[in-house]
Amino acid sequence: MRRARGRRPPGEFFDVGGHRLHLHCAGRGAPAVVFDAALGASALSWTLVQPEVARVTRACTYDRAGLGWSEAGPLPRTAGRIAGELRQLLHAAGVGPPYVLVGHSFGALVVRIFAARHRGETAGLVLVDPAHPEEWLDPSEDDRRNLDRGVRLCRYGASAARPRVAHVVAALARLGARRPARAIVAAITRGSFDRADENILAPVLKLPMDARRVLTRFWTRPEFFEALGSQIGAVCESASEVRDAERGGPDDLPLTTISATTSSARRLALQEALARSSSRGRHVVAHHSGHWIPLDEPALVVEEILRIVGRRS
């Protein structure tokens, strides 16, 4: 595995059946709070949240296989497979239940499956601008085209990473030069990467500079794009896995959904309904955030996590 240079991995590596995942835990106490990041994000996306939670209890971030500092894992990268690897990782590291599971975007699908499969190990859920399975169980033709485009873009990314084109884009993004970085990405992808600024380049600038350097180096690994492309290509299967795992399950788990102000009306309604599905559910709107709530309003995320932790302390 080629690790990102310039910053030593903050955590440790544990084998989960042929490949090693990076886990970083800080703080002491129970229940342990376990974070799962957005689709192509790493443990670094919790940089502004984890230290504050660690003041109160144990807080653990990790990198899914192929992302961040973790080694590549078997394909396809479905939420169900990832949830199984996460449980293996926690057991290998000696991080015992109960867990408060925190999932951002795609990570919400992973932690919902984990909670449904292991209800007795789960103390609560905090879902941050969560993807919802209903969005992908019956995708429209436009949705399918977008998924196909996402997979295709990841193939371009993997190809660009090998001759070090991605190094140039990463360096420009790290320095805040969005326009030339976006122009290069658009050229590589033949103009189809129309949301590069919002989804990939903008979040980089919300991180401290040292984390920014490491994050952009992650983009220079072909494994990153291969894992991301597999997650995108398998998102409909992941949605089905959530539906099947939760079928007939209990509805009294402490659960908080946090919505972004930029959420579509449909996504907002789904997130509100998800909170109502639990007798101990709660829905919150992050009024000053786009999709990257952990970077825009980390204090709000910390507050909602500790609200659930406090019930179990």
Predicted features along the sequence, with ranges:
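Conserved HGGG/HGGXW glycine-rich cap/lid loop of the alpha/beta-hydrolase fold
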Residues: 19-69, 109, 117
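The conserved beta1-alpha1 loop
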Residues: 34-38, 104, 129
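Active-site loop/oxyanion-hole signature of alpha/beta-hydrolase fold enzymes
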Residues: 64-102, 118, 134-146
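Residue in the alpha/beta-hydrolase core beta-strand immediately N-terminal to the catalytic nucleophile
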Residues: 99-100, 123-126
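Gly/Ala-rich beta-loop-alpha elbow adjacent to hydrolase catalytic centers
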Residues: 103-107, 111
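Flexible "cap/lid" loop of the alpha/beta hydrolase fold
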Residues: 126-175
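Conserved serine/cysteine hydrolase catalytic core
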Residues: 181, 196, 203-285
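Catalytic active-site module of serine/aspartate enzymes centered on a nucleophile-bearing elbow/loop
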Residues: 278-313
